Each structure stands twice: as structure tokens, then as C-alpha cells.
Amino acid sequence: MKTFYAPLSELAGIEQLKKDFEVTGQPVMISGCIDTQKIHLVHAAVNDYRFRLIITGDEAKAREMQEDSRFFDKSSIYYPAKDFIFYSADVHGNQLAGERLRCIQKIIAAQDNKTNITVITTIDGCVDMLMPLQRYRDNIIHFKNSDIIDTEKLISKLVGIGYTRVPM
């Protein structure tokens, strides 16, 4: 990948971008180029960082950028925003929730394995209130085929993490 990053790394603008980012630690906006160039610039500028967050205007652009980003970083993922249109949320609710949980799972795995990850989302995806990652970690339940499960303990654990018990 250095073949793709080296020409950009020598540009004064990229060097200034890296320096500004290291000094301030603040988010950086890249504009004035097409989306595929933005992905190339992002990966060249922040290649040394393990966690990268790219925020874009709409879902279609975010998904397209995620596909482009996979060329530079195989662990690039798209974090979908919560669907605020109730009809659409009802139809796609489980699919979106599943995608978001898979994304959180990959972030936790990257953090545990000390690997790089690039998360691409929309501004609406940033509005979503999430629990801290440690709370997700603390509430992961593992089962083996040979386990004997105490249903009352399992029920109390599930209720404790937010599930609702309903009569069958």
C-alpha cells in the first residue's frame, strides 16, 4: 500500500494536514475532490492511526465510500443510521439493528486485537446515542453446546441488559 500512499505523503498539503491533526487532535474536513480521491487522501493522511471515522452527507455516498475504502483497508465498515421514518424503520428495523450490532462487534474486535478499522457513516449515524463499548463487552453472553443453562439466571441477565420479558 505504500506505493499508493508515498506520492501523496510528499505533498505539502498532506504533511500540513497530518501536522494539524497531530497537534489539535480535532476532526479534519477534506473538500474539493471527488469521493474516491477523498478516500485515498484519508487513508494516506491517517494511515498511522488505528481508528478512523469518515462522516458523509447521505447513506448512498457513505456506502459507496465504504466500498472504495475496502481497497485500502479490508476492515472498512459502514455504520447505518437509525431510521427515523417509522414505516421504513418497521420494514427494515431488524436488518438495520443487525448491521449496527455487527459494526459494533467489529469495533470491539479491532480494539481487542489492536488492529486498524475504518468506520464510515452519515451525520445521522453520529446522532445515534450508544452505550459505551465497555458496557457491550460486559454484557456479552457465551454459550457452549455442553453448557447447562440456568434459565432464571439467564432471564435476569437479559432483563438487566434491557430485554423485556413477555409471557409465552
Task: Give the positions of each predicted feature.
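ASCE RecA-like P-loop NTPase motor cores
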Residues: 1-168
